[in-house]
């Protein structure tokens, strides 16, 4: 359970600042971002099973260090180790499913994975708050140990050792060549880039004004470093940690935009809605978790339901679009919450918002599986998860700025005799003790307005996610091929039946018969025969398939199959 962050090694209850800093800039977060992209390469170079188990071991070691930390330095180091390990866990789980299940069945299983991920994102911090208040903050980390052991035993016993040994030819490279494949130059430049961006978004408007020289300098340096990172990636080519050939794909960048925005919206609601229950309804951390169940259940149920519907219909783009719409509407309704809002409102709004996130959050990972060939799936998965995580971090930082600034201005405008800094440093459940009884009603109104303002950030990011969702190609997960350029070779109109196996195999058939020029005369045409004797056609966007008669085609199909 990494959601609960403890800024000081003590037994005090979580303050508002603590809660807002569950996903802030710190050393662990930077290493987490680095690790996510690194694992995209590592999973291509080494067997998925063993990489996953090593990542899990690092996460467990980091959790143990955090739980036993005698000082803040030890806690930070433990978080770094845990972050390096956790960066490979979700991507590894997705890739393990991809290895054992055909494309059309992955939607359902990935839906269940996404549901558990969403539940953990919401429930983890709330459980951490309860542990901190009632037991000890160390339990936030110790609880990971038995759960990790059970996971490791299951993976070790049930996943074969050499099931994916032929997945990527680069696995046979010597260690020196594998290190060159890791794009160390890009990784080194990416670290300060992330630090500058996160510091600027976290400090701007709170610790320093947006026009402060420090904030401007951070943005300028971050931009320059980002440009340098892009240049390095272009120079590295396919060795890059984010290969340019991958970024050029419409599915990858559209899914990245969608994931960045929708997950950012999801985390804003996940972390500020419990504050509303604690400050406005007087809940404890545990009670706010119970009142947050409609959101958790909505996300979980509709994530699994969306996976089943994608499995049945064959398409996932519709779920992304619907998810964006429902999430934006749900977040908008949450922004209307008042001090006296009844249970029917906050339950209904949560269910609607949870449905939107459930429908949409997991679909980009299905899109990556459908649109990319095997050798790019791990890198594509890592890029989408990176953008998802980074989007959540940026959205939380922006929402925190909105909350802090609005609360201070509301306190001053209402003439409430309380120090805003002191208000931000105590727990949301301790508000009543800060002011005299006659001022508490005004304080609640100020607090309610400040929290609901953060939901506008969730509305905006959910709305922006629609730009990505409508650009995701309509591909079918029911087709038996995974072309390298599926976005053009295998795109059909929504809800049409997929092409027959003869139609899908046409490019390979014609090439083998000599009716289409060889690879040397075409623009990046690649052919690959995947597992289970499936015919896979890889067509570039510029190549065109020549027509042939049905009778001739059928004879060639039979000849090839025999």
UniProtKB/Swiss-Prot annotation:
Region feature (Disordered): 515-562
Keyword Lyase: no
Topology in membrane: Multi-pass membrane protein
TM segment ranges: 50-70, 80-100, 111-131, 139-159, 184-204, 215-235, 257-277, 288-308, 309-329, 351-371, 383-403, 455-475
GO BP term, pick one: transmembrane transport
Biased composition (Polar residues): 533-554
Location, primary (coarse class): membrane
Residues bearing glycans: 448
Pfam families per UniProt: MFS_1 (PF07690)
Keywords of this entry: Cell membrane, Glycoprotein, Membrane, Transmembrane, Transmembrane helix, Transport
Signal peptide: none
Coiled coil: none
Nucleotide-binding is among the record's keywords: no
A Gene Ontology term for the protein's cellular component: plasma membrane
GO molecular function, one term: transmembrane transporter activity
Induction: Expression is up-regulated during the late stage of P.nodorum wheat leaf infection and is controlled by the cluster specific transporter elcR.
Cell compartments where the protein resides: Cell membrane
Role, per record: MFS-type efflux pump; part of the gene cluster that mediates the biosynthesis of elsinochrome C, a perelyenequinone phytotoxin structurally similar to cercosporin.
Family: Belongs to the major facilitator superfamily. TCR/Tet family.
Name of the protein in question: MFS-type efflux pump elcC
